[in-house]
């Protein structure tokens, strides 16, 4: 997403990045289109739930200083809606959780791929997944770690993750 990013916008939006709002709005739109909007929360309510830790995520006040919201945060917050509206994608994430029960990284990658696949308006590339999973302002790049985990998932016949036209996709 081509969102403005300045010191002021970061300060005003923390722990979210400008792109998160575009992602959230498009994700809510995709969920509404699939479910007819029944039972969906507003973007403001989802953000409040993330900040207060009411939808399954840890409250922002309980996070370390510098923590950033990610696509994983949004998936976790909207998991019930995703399960109802995009059953096959939700089940694919579940298969990753079964195959890699002790790896939060693999599970988080699956959640990020799921969000991007649902959106359908942003390439589901390794770089985008890595960027949208960046956990804190002080964290170094996770590109190589994520690349290794993605390769493990692609090479596991029980994980329905593949590549199509340079994008990661749940099959």
What is each residue range found by the language model?
Residues 24, 109-114:
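Short alpha-helical scaffolding segments that buttress acidic/His motifs in well-ordered protein cores
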Residues 151-167:
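A short, conserved structural fragment
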């Amino acid at each position: 997403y081509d969102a403005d990013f300045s010191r002021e916008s970061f300060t005003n939006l923390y722990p979210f990045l400008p792109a998160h709002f575009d992602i959230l709005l498009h994700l809510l739109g995709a969920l509404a289109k699939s479910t007819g909007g029944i039972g969906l929360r507003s973007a403001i309510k989802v953000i409040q739930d993330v900040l207060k830790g009411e939808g399954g995520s840890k409250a922002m006040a309980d996070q370390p200083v510098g923590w950033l919201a990610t696509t994983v945060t949004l998936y976790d917050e909207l998991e019930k809606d995703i399960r109802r509206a995009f059953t096959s994608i939700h089940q694919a994430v579940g298969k990753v959780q079964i195959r890699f029960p002790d790896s939060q990284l693999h599970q988080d990658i699956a959640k990020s791929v799921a969000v991007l696949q649902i959106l359908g308006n942003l390439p589901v590339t390794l770089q985008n997944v890595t960027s949208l999973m960046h956990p804190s302002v002080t964290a170094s790049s996770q590109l190589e770690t994520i690349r290794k985990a993605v390769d493990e998932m692609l090479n596991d016949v029980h994980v329905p993750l593949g590549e199509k036209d340079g994008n990661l996709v749940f099959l």
